[in-house]
Amino acid sequence: EITTRLVGSEMCIRDSYTGALDELFDCQFGRLPYRSLRFDFEHYEKESYQGHSVVNYTVSEDFTRITEFKYLTGQKNTDGTTIVKEYPFAYTGAEGEIPYYAILEPKNQELYEKYHALAGGLPHFYLLGRLAEYKYYNIDAMTKKAMELADAIMAENTKR
């Protein structure tokens, strides 16, 4: 626990962690498996590429999604359109790679629980998000959870 004095009153620091939990502990039990993504941007000199903002692909292509940005931003530009194709690959922790999605299998959950137990020993330390909690969240659920955590921390502070 970190305490500090601010204008004569004691204050307890609370930490919320949103990064990969295995990396916080230097992968001492092994690396948690994640799916990463490579993004390939392409520009086309035509009004539209696919007619929709996002099209998901399951098995027909090597990429999993194409996003055409003009439909997300409301652009009226008719001189061209830009898309991005998302290609999945296994996250290895190499420089420049980003872990995006937990690979939710029982053996991976068991490994996560080891790291979770280590984090549980840290006072006033809160895990939040896809990487720290090793689960998938939609943005609306994640926003709600973050606000609930903030409320809980504020309520805890008023008890002190």
PLM features: what roles do these ranges have?
Residues 6, 17, 127:
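Short glycine/serine/threonine-biased micro-segments
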Residues 1-13:
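Single conserved hydrophobic/aromatic residue that forms the stacking wall/gate
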Residues 14, 18-23:
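Glycine-/small-residue-rich beta->alpha transition segments that form the dinucleotide
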Residues 23-159:
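C-terminal segments that line or cap access tunnels to active or ligand-binding sites in enzymes
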